[in-house]
């Protein structure tokens, strides 16, 4: 027999017996009765954002700000999911995927600075995998570093080619 006081441990992906939007309604009702601001913990509000997102992906809804109790008595679960999904979708469209400069990194591999010009290729691939994991800031940082290193090694390769051609044609035979 389960103890009603202690919560049962569950898998992170499974749904709880109490739906999170219903839990939020209960918390806002308590807030209205006591006339005190009830701060939701970060883990609870994060779980609410994840569940209302409808995708179970770790996207934060930044444009929502602080949660306000709804004016209607009991909004349906589907409507709260739809509204949150619209906010998340519009936020995701505002931030475009950063460039990884993979073509530039591959082009730098043809320059004569051979072991060093693999470094921008590695950073470019790391940037692409960061985008797939959802880390846009890290992907942007790695993409910029890949671009900087690619351009640097292309310029260094051109300098090496110019020096080699100059030395080859100016040395008397």
Swiss-Prot record:
Recorded superkingdom: Eukaryota
Main subcellular location of this protein, as a coarse class: membrane
GO cellular-component term (any): cytoplasmic vesicle membrane
Subcellular location: Cell membrane; Endomembrane system; Cytoplasm, Perinuclear region
Membrane-traversing stretches: 151-171
Keywords, ordered alphabetically: Cell membrane, Cytoplasm, Membrane, Phosphoprotein, Transmembrane, Transmembrane helix
Pfam family, one: CD225
Tissue spec: Present in adipose tissue and undetectable in other tissues (at protein level).
Membrane topology per record: Single-pass membrane protein
Intramembrane region spans per record: 103-123
Region entry Disordered, spans: 1-22
Side Cytoplasmic, residues: 1-102, 124-150
Biased composition (Polar residues): 1-17
GO BP term (any one): establishment of localization in cell
Induction context: Down-regulated upon cold exposure in brown adipose tissue in Zucker lean rats. Down-regulated by dexamethasone.
Ranges in the topological domain labelled Extracellular: 172-173
Residue positions, PTM Phosphoserine: 16, 43, 45, 70, 84-85
Protein family: Belongs to the CD225/Dispanin family.
Chain's role: Regulates insulin-mediated adipose tissue glucose uptake and transport by modulation of SLC2A4 recycling. Not required for SLC2A4 membrane fusion upon an initial stimulus, but rather is necessary for proper protein recycling during prolonged insulin stimulation.
Subunit annotation: Interacts with SLC2A4; the interaction is required for proper SLC2A4 reacycling after insulin stimulation.
Name of the protein this chain belongs to: Trafficking regulator of GLUT4 1
Species for this entry: Rattus norvegicus
Gene that specifies this protein: Trarg1
